[in-house]
């Protein structure tokens, strides 16, 4: 049964603290620290009773407790309660007591945390969810998710041991205990900082403020407003305007659609509202708080579903969401807790029957639901979607929009950027952007066409493009609709422009090692589920090895040695580069979103390097063994430079394949479209053949020689040629290369240069990945 919001709010005082009970919520009473009203008495059951609303009044229900629940002196199973009710738990005379009274009426002039930009307009800070006294005898108040804390916060975004509030002679200090998502003071991450009255301590979805000797808790339940004020974005040194003075309010629990012709600034507005690319001028107020100023904290409460899927399509729905939960929740979150949350969002979005299916096998609408489920894991208050119905048929379009309507009704603010006008009627508000990034309309969807003077949306969009002289924005500003829906609905005063914002600190992430392990498991699972990729990975080294073996014959001779080594080089380059050349560009959207919520750049890259590196090295070993097994190598005295000849050649091929893999990652990070990777792979192979030293005389040729130093196959062929002393077997000018000498120093130089090239490529990939990150956090 859903709670009844028409019932009055009540204040319950129990166990030395007080809680204002919101009629839209259910309150659990018992010894369970995760409950809303916690009683520390052995006579009280773990789950003792429930307080909830029903048909406009409050209802007390006993949950089959051992020692009973007593209202006004008599034992009850369930009964109506209200202001003046006295409830005892566990014993009718001296059991823990809860007294109910009417909640104090919020006063607009009541003190609010000073770090809120506009306290009078905020909903979260209008009334504390709970008030807890801070006894001076206890100098440390421990805050976290674990039951043993002094202040238990039932939120998976909160670590089990999250923070401590320390009382000292000079006041209070907040100390972060190495939490997953961080502790924030007035929106900024802190490790240790002094707290004064009016400051906001942010922990998960909760905010705490000191008021005298009390700690007031304010919970962000998701019902938050958004106020957009005078956003402007300019490019080309101010010569071109993408957004021009965009202002509008978005109420709690509402669904807003943003439409407009191409080039009207829809994507620019989305980036500005989410904080990914802040506007050059103006402000975005999240429930009275400056989003850009407090972005480090508030970004955890923002969900963004891009147009492209943000999950690995080879994985099943349940498995993909499970890996996402491991990355987004604290490392100390129990597996059962994560799985419970995954199952909850799967059920909420109607995906229970599809949970074991691979994502790529789902319909477009179902895949979009999975992407939404990913964002709902962390219970965001604001949910943004970019073109969620793109490519869907009208039925699926309608289904997705009704899903978003339901998400808003459940207590979220949902903003969707779309080109589809089929289901605008389910939205509360519609924002129409005209070319130049100006507001042509904001208000109820049903009034939009009448305001423009058209009967169909295609006519309106054609007019936007054709009638460029018409002042669409000016007409709207002069209309009664602007006064009613923008000037009238906006509850927050104009926000003064602040100084330009620099990059914020990177999100406080799960431990680097924990992220790396999760990323490696997920990547290995995705690779193993891609059957086509597996077949290619297995077949390629055998095919190239067989070609090398056919050329080598039974022995490396004057006629076969150079060609056999060349084929090994080509095979290693193709194997390594083919493994990696698509891996970063195809995950561009996934990386951008995960980086924004705390993914470590280096852990992400290292997961690719380690998993692909292991696969590539195994392939290189197979390639060499197939190519040279049983072949007489004709090394001097049957020995290599430092080790047996076959071992040295295998090491050279493996290191070349690894370096080629790093080169493939570099190309994948460099390009913007997956389609161009295959032509570039062919080009890479040609360059390796030309500059390896097997076809052209490079030593002593100005320009070509220096250019060849950047080509991995040049050094790998040198190492292999040195192992067998190729100039001795093939005595010609081409093999009289200084890098082909059978000397330990030369062989080690060849191998060392492959390592150096790998490291340089890794550094370059890291810098290129930085380009894909949200602009506000690049550093």
List where the protein language model places each region.
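Forkhead-associated
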Residues: 18-91, 133-205
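Conserved ABC transporter NBD signature motif
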Residues: 56, 71, 185, 282-290, ...
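Topological signature of polytopic alpha-helical transporters
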Residues: 172, 180-181, 185-186, 196-200, ...
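Helix-to-loop junction immediately C-terminal to a conserved catalytic motif
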Residues: 274
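Q-loop/switch helix immediately C-terminal to the Walker
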Residues: 313-330
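Conserved ABC ATPase "signature" region
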Residues: 337-354
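ABC ATPase C-loop
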Residues: 375-377
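Membrane-spanning alpha-helical segments of multipass transporters and channels
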Residues: 454-457, 525-779
